[in-house]
Amino acid sequence: MSHELTLQELAEFSANFNADPKNQVIARAAARSGVLEASYNERVAGRLTRVFSTELPTDNVTNQKQSGRCWLFSTLNVLRHDFGAKHKAKNFTLSQSYNFFWDKLERANLFYEKVIETADKPLDDREVRSYFDFAGHDGGQWHMAISLVKKYGVVPSYVMPESFNTSATNGLASALADKERKDALALRRLAQAGDQEGLEKARKTFLNEIYRMVAIAVGEPPKTFDLEYRDDDKNYHLEKNLTPVSFFNKYFDVDLDDYVVLTNAPDHEYGKLYHLGAEDNVEGGSPILFLNVPMEYLEQTAVAQLKDGEAVWFGNDVLRQMDRKTGYLDTDLYKLEDLFDVDLSLSKADRLATGAGEVSHAMTLVGVDEDKGDIRQWKVENSWGDKSGEKGFFVMSHNWFKEYVYEVVVHKKYLTKDQQELLSSTPVELAPWDSLA
């Protein structure tokens, strides 16, 4: 049944609002400083500290600037922690630009493939539309990053440093999106006509043009480089003529295939393996897999990995209850319910199911604070530069972890036997518009 707002109803709403004098005081405060500042809970600062019972050695933070590459930054942060610990090299950083280059090319290739596969469906089909919407996109997942590392290796940041177009990706992303969508229409026509020869020729031409665009904007990646650094004991190290792949294989003590994305998505069935094929970025690369488990397993495995001296990649909804200046993450940080006198509560499952919750960011766990086995707070390495938080490091309450963390990446050795067996099960395929996308 439809309902039209009447003048009588609106007058009643206004009378109700003005009947309480406190509303005018609150409205003036909110109008002057904004609803977040007006509802800021100062008591949170008294609960969150910068001291942790388990804490990894940390380096200077990185800065993704105006780009959506947090997933790549967090992955490379985990890897540089491994390099720093193994080779006693503080503040050694890896090039995000290098893997960003290959990501753009690989994504275009897979986008063209999906366009060809779905050429028999109309453009307004939900699956087809989701692929077109994702063209030129920066966002990503853990498995997307490791697919790039496994295929192309890594290089130190001085070999391929950040540039304008990697730090502010909108211009390139927009151009790539326009190019890929235009190409997609041509590929659909060729596929619908059954012109296989023309299809392969066009795809190769289009990928050659994508390569040129990214090379102009970012620069071509190096084929070889010289590794040069001084360790914490002031010893000088030099190895010449390394390839990015040989550098990774020789200098990093990690098998990326041994790591698992544990997710807590209570709108999905627990004890299941899920595959988000729509966001795979490398043909033949690591599929995007999630093992969905109750929250306590994310907590337990993350703590165990930190205690063993290894950082933890984690996916979260950072825009919720976050103060960028202080670096505080706490569920009671902004008391919006008190400000508006309404109930804003949603369960984690309901937030995911309605689009109110999402994995909007990836960061790195580098510490945890426990009191007699109870987790109080976590130390977080962000990728927003050193002007936010304490020199770029955030403090996250455990309540925030439970509400707004959806994924942690841990070694499979920390899983239960049953969970390890699930890794070889047939995954449930997720739609491109799923809440985990």
Swiss-Prot record:
Keywords: Aminopeptidase, Cytoplasm, Hydrolase, Protease, Thiol protease. Coiled coil: none annotated. GO terms for molecular function: cysteine-type aminopeptidase activity. InterPro entries: Papain-like_cys_pep_sf, Pept_cys_AS, Pept_his_AS, Peptidase_C1B. GO terms for biological process: homocysteine catabolic process; proteolysis; response to toxic substance. This is Aminopeptidase G. Its main location: cytoplasm. The keyword Zinc-finger does not apply. It comes from Lactobacillus delbrueckii subsp. lactis. It is found in: Cytoplasm. One of its GO terms (cellular component) is cytoplasm. The active site is at 70, 361, 382. PANTHER family: BLEOMYCIN HYDROLASE (PTHR10363:SF2). Its EC number is 3.4.22.-. The keyword Hydrolase applies. Belongs to the peptidase C1 family.
